[in-house]
Amino acid sequence: MAFNDDNFMLKNEAAKRLYQQIKDQPIFDYHCHLDPKEIFEDKVYDNIVDLWLGGDHYKWRLMRANGISEEEITGSASKLDKFKAFARTLQRSYGNPVYHWSVMELKNVFGVCELLTEDNAEEIYHRINAYLVEHQISPRKLIADSRVRFIGTTDHPLDDLAWHKRLAADDTFETVVAPTFRPDEAFIEHQRFADFVARLAQATGRTITDFKSFIAAMEERIAYFAENGCKASDISFTEIVFEAAEPEQLDRLMTRVLEGYQPQPLEVKQWQTAVFAELCRLYKHYGFVTQVHFGALRNNHSAIFNKLGADVGVDSLGDQTGLAINMNRLLDHLVQRDSLPKMIWYNLNPSYNIAVANTLANFQANENGIAGYLQFGAGWWFADTKLGMISQMNALAEQGLLANFVGMLTDSRSFLSYQRHDYFRRILSTYLGEWIEEGEVPEDYQALGKMAQDIAYNNAIQYFN
């Protein structure tokens, strides 16, 4: 069987027919970690390592597993040596999604059809570098060539959004680049919580002395984001919790934490519950889609974390006792307060997929006739794989309506990652095609094609607008 050809990952004739209906659809990338400054400045790349390996902790993780020295991963080794080290690793990465992403990027972006190996790495390195300059490869060109219509970045609540404003005012750039409100530092276990409160007070001109004044200041920032095109929020929780507390308890807790007190686990849960509930109330009011990423155990290799910081490839998926009961209680609490916004829940540990999809199905009722009001998000991070995607879609199809799914997102720091949308579309086509081939659904290519088109693009547009 041919590898990485036009029928890559399309396992049956039905899949090939369905893929033809979605392969050229635009991309609505509603969540990523791209830098709007880089998009605005639009500098032409002259080295593949800067574009392909810089900041890519997926690749760094594999390179460490292959015995590559840190010098050749994040250190001061030459760019050519880093490229060769990755080529050496890529040869041994069969079965890992990074292999598929990489060969797709090499072929579809740079026209490199031969497989990258240690033997041809230097020649391909120089060839791609020449291609970058000759074809003026820049962030905006990569975005335009990938037919990206919308980009949702991930932004600190105190960001002035200057680069988003400049992009919005630039009539030469058609892609919408919208900020996303990401208030990780608003939670008391965060090491920069006290600093965040001080900066929040300064940014809003408010005196923050208690929980109520803290939330009022947060609302001011949410309103500012809304004024500047924000359509969504995001948050990352290690665990989903529900632990109620009285306002007076929250006031005392906040005062103590700002004085240097280390909160206890119960207090962390109480604060997380209260702050998230208030934020959801505000998100609903301002029309933000609320994204919740959960289940990551971060920065586990303390030496590497202390040297390089966060998001460098030493994170894991976690487990949680009582996920279903906490998630149900939290969502019910939001419903009772009329504070349930549109939400996308991204579960990192696939063993909880059915529980998550089943829980979300309890709370889909809404007065606005919105299909898929609560979304079970695509396979995230370590579940952003062929099996991870299938597991997520299986759970959603069995427990809800797959046809209402808002589909793929890159969640990436790389301008090359739009190939992941094509990867997803191929897997989706095979997934739906197998239903046809196995007689599980009618052989109705108009209906299944419409379903595939909706999942690939149309549902996301409708959901975020």
Swiss-Prot record:
PANTHER family in alphabetical order: URONATE ISOMERASE
Annotated EC: 5.3.1.12
Organism of origin: Streptococcus equi subsp. equi (strain 4047)
Swiss-Prot/TrEMBL keywords: Isomerase
Pathway membership: Carbohydrate metabolism; pentose and glucuronate interconversion
Coiled coil start-end: none
InterPro entries xrefs: Metal_Hydrolase, Uronate_isomerase
Enzyme class label: isomerase
Lineage: Bacteria, Bacillati, Bacillota, Bacilli, Lactobacillales
GO biological process: D-galacturonate catabolic process; D-glucuronate catabolic process
One Gene Ontology MF term: glucuronate isomerase activity
Keyword Zinc-finger part of the UniProt annotation: no
Catalytic reactions of this protein: D-glucuronate = D-fructuronate; aldehydo-D-galacturonate = keto-D-tagaturonate
Domain of life, per lineage: Bacteria
Encoding gene (name): uxaC
Family, per entry: Belongs to the metallo-dependent hydrolases superfamily. Uronate isomerase family.
Protein name: Uronate isomerase
